[in-house]
């Protein structure tokens, strides 16, 4: 019987920095007895314990591969000399919860995931982790957990779905993704598409397992995981069903044990330079606005000083290169075909736009990883050359002004107008705007203002994909500006500004906008203003009170009490 397993001495890192308390000595006999029941033999108590945290479920195709991949990780941990222990956490499907009460819970799930992984890892004193995720909020939730725990960790993405294919009534044939269905709903409601074609699109959009295929939030965060150095190089782009994913899973299991041997922890990797690399890659791909929210939250957990201003500072230097959906023509599978994320990273590194000395989960630097992979050049079509970009600056911008003194976020990659000015149409929450659009009350040139959808006021900072999809489907995508203290889906297209801070419930200027007020957005100057006299605005504040809280019990009530501004990443604490 193994009762004692000696710790390492000298300068060599302890490969079991946390689990000795449950494996070593007489007092650990009860814990060892429990561990024997789940498969430990005498020789296993000397091995590092690796938590394999999986957000697998059967609710959404995004996570279907994770059961298979977790088992491959387990094999890799064994091969590396560790003992793997799989445990689960939740995941919410944004695609299913979109446009109704369920979306209040989406961003909340990010915190639940991070908290639940922390809880298991801390309670069981597990030494290291491999964190598997497939849907929008589970990716940042896992990365937040890694940063918070600061143990040896590797992140692994489930992979994206293959595009669907549809043939419409008029003979048109095209690839489709989930976002096409949201836009088809709007087109059908506006009489621009038949119910038959809507049905055809519905049946085609999800041909199998994997996350939504464009450069939407899940794929953006997968690219960020790789750019941060928290995922194995080349692991973000292969589709979910591709067996290369099993190889990456096995290697991730081996890698985390090697990180323990070398004493490398998450915060050794997740430095300010790593976050700057992640922002640069996001800008080059034209990634989701949600990346801003999530990177701020992950950086806070890593104790890295990341501010909204960093996104503009970096974005002004980085060209937008990815011709990717929702605004472009291609999907993540196409990125994989031309070499994956390393192709973009090498191009940026060669141009002096990345920190090549940033450490990664391989134990090597970013530059060393790219030299070993030797990725191909940018193909020039899916990923444009640096001297022939889609836009000269990055795909995201932070705006500030009298309407958003705390900041707002816009995906400039799809913003066709440099300057937009129009009269406000104000709605308390999303449903009112949907009803007005259906009734034909929203016209070209309007600025649709949806408020009380912020982190605290929603609560949960819902994504506005239902209304943006409906606006585009109605043929108004280039003619109506939508702004909100809520969020937008990574699949949103059109003139959209989100994350307006302070939010309405906190008496931000958005709370005092009235129908007919002129609002002006100037993208080149990154300004965002309410063109109302200051004296008039002050008069509107007299006697003002926010809308009453919608939820007084349960997780949403707790969340509303704890959550901070979107300008700080909507973190809780």
Swiss-Prot record:
Keyword hit for S-adenosyl-L-methionine: no
Keywords, alphabetical: 2Fe-2S, Amino-acid biosynthesis, Branched-chain amino acid biosynthesis, Iron, Iron-sulfur, Lyase, Magnesium, Metal-binding
Binding site for Mg(2+): 94, 136-137, 463
Active-site residues per Swiss-Prot or TrEMBL entry: 489 (proton acceptor)
SUPFAM superfamilies (alphabetical): IlvD/EDD N-terminal domain-like (SSF143975), LeuD/IlvD-like (SSF52016)
N6-carboxylysine: modified positions: 137
Chemical reaction(s) catalysed: (2R)-2,3-dihydroxy-3-methylbutanoate = 3-methyl-2-oxobutanoate + H2O; (2R,3R)-2,3-dihydroxy-3-methylpentanoate = (S)-3-methyl-2-oxopentanoate + H2O
Residues where [2Fe-2S] cluster binds: 62, 135, 212
Top EC class, one word: lyase
Molecular function via GO: 2 iron, 2 sulfur cluster binding; dihydroxy-acid dehydratase activity; magnesium ion binding
UniProt cofactor(s): [2Fe-2S] cluster; Mg(2+)
EC number: 4.2.1.9
Cofactor binding note from Swiss-Prot or TrEMBL: Binds 1 [2Fe-2S] cluster per subunit. This cluster acts as a Lewis acid cofactor.
Pathway(s) the chain acts in: Amino-acid biosynthesis; L-isoleucine biosynthesis; L-isoleucine from 2-oxobutanoate: step 3/4; Amino-acid biosynthesis; L-valine biosynthesis; L-valine from pyruvate: step 3/4
InterPro entries referenced in this protein's UniProt entry, alphabetically: DHAD_IlvD/Edd, Dihydro-acid_dehy_C, DihydroxyA_deHydtase, DiOHA_6PGluconate_deHydtase_CS, ILV_EDD_C, ILV_EDD_N, IlvD/EDD_N
Alphabetical GO biological process terms: isoleucine biosynthetic process; L-valine biosynthetic process
NCBIfam families on file: ilvD, PRK00911.1
Complexes and interactors: Homodimer.
PANTHER family: DIHYDROXY-ACID DEHYDRATASE DAD, DIHYDROXY-ACID DEHYDRATASE, MITOCHONDRIAL
Annotated family: Belongs to the IlvD/Edd family.
Function, in words: Functions in the biosynthesis of branched-chain amino acids. Catalyzes the dehydration of (2R,3R)-2,3-dihydroxy-3-methylpentanoate (2,3-dihydroxy-3-methylvalerate) into 2-oxo-3-methylpentanoate (2-oxo-3-methylvalerate) and of (2R)-2,3-dihydroxy-3-methylbutanoate (2,3-dihydroxyisovalerate) into 2-oxo-3-methylbutanoate (2-oxoisovalerate), the penultimate precursor to L-isoleucine and L-valine, respectively.
Name of the protein described by the UniProt record: Dihydroxy-acid dehydratase
Species of the source: Renibacterium salmoninarum (strain ATCC 33209 / DSM 20767 / JCM 11484 / NBRC 15589 / NCIMB 2235)
Name of the gene this protein is made from: ilvD
């Amino acid at each position: 019987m193994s009762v004692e397993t000696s710790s390492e001495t000298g300068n060599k890192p302890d490969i079991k920095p946390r689990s000795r308390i449950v494996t070593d000595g007489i007092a650990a006999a009860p814990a060892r007895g429990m561990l024997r029941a789940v498969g430990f033999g005498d020789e296993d108590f000397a091995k590092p314990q690796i938590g394999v945290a999986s957000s697998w479920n059967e609710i959404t195709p995004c996570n279907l591969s994770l059961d298979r991949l977790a088992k491959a990780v387990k094999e890799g941990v064994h091969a590396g000399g560790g003992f793997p222990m799989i445990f689960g956490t939740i995941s919410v499907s944004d695609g299913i919860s979109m446009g109704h009460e369920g979306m209040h819970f989406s961003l909340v799930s990010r915190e639940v995931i991070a908290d639940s992984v922390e809880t298991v890892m801390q309670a069981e004193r597990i030494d290291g982790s491999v964190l598997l995720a497939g849907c929008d909020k589970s990716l940042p939730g896992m990365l937040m957990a890694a940063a918070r725990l600061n143990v040896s960790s590797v992140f692994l993405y489930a992979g994206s779905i293959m595009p669907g294919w549809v043939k419409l009534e008029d003979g048109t044939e095209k690839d489709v993704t989930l976002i096409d269905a949201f836009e088809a709903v709007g087109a059908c409601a506006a009489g621009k598409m038949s119910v038959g074609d809507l049905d055809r699109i519905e049946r085609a959009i999800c041909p199998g397992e994997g996350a939504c295929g464009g450069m939407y939030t899940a794929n953006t965060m997968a690219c960020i995981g790789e750019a941060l150095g928290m995922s194995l190089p080349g692991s973000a782009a292969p589709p979910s069903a591709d067996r290369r994913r099993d190889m990456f899973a096995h290697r991730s299991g081996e890698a985390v044990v090697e990180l323990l041997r070398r004493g490398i922890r998450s915060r050794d990797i997740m430095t300010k330079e790593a976050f700057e690399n992640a922002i640069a890659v996001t800008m080059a791909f034209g990634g989701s606005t949600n990346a801003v929210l999530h990177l701020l939250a992950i950086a806070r957990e890593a104790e890295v000083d990341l501010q909204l201003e960093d996104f503009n500072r970096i974005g002004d230097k980085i060209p937008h290169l990815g011709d990717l959906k929702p605004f472009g023509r291609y999907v993540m599978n196409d990125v994989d075909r031309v070499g994956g994320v390393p192709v973009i990273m090498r191009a940026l590194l060669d141009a002096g736009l990345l920190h090549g000395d940033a450490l990664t989960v391989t134990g090597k630097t970013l530059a060393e990883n790219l030299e070993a992979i030797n990725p191909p050049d940018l193909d020039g079509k899916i990923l444009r050359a640096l001297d022939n970009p889609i836009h000269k600056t990055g795909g995201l911008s932070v705006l500030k002004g009298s309407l958003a003194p705390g900041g707002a976020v816009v995906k400039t990659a799809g913003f066709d107008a440099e300057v937009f000015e129009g009269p406000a149409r104000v709605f308390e929450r999303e449903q009112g705007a949907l009803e007005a659009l259906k009734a034909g009350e929203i016209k070209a040139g309007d600025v649709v203002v949806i408020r009380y959808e912020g982190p605290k006021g929603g609560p949960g900072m819902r994504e506005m994909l239902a209304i943006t999809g409906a606006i585009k489907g109605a043929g108004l995508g280039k003619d109506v500006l939508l702004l909100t203290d809520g969020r937008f889906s990574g699949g949103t297209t059109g003139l959209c500004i989100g994350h307006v801070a302070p939010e309405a419930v906190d008496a931000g200027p958005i709370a005092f906008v009235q129908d007919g007020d002129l609002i002006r957005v100037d993208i080149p100057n990154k300004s965002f203003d309410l063109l109302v006299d200051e004296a008039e605005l002050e008069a509107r504040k007299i006697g003002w009170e926010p809308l009453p809280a919608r939820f007084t019990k349960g997780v949403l009530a707790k969340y509303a009490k704890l959550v901070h501004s979107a300008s700080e990443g909507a973190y809780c604490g």
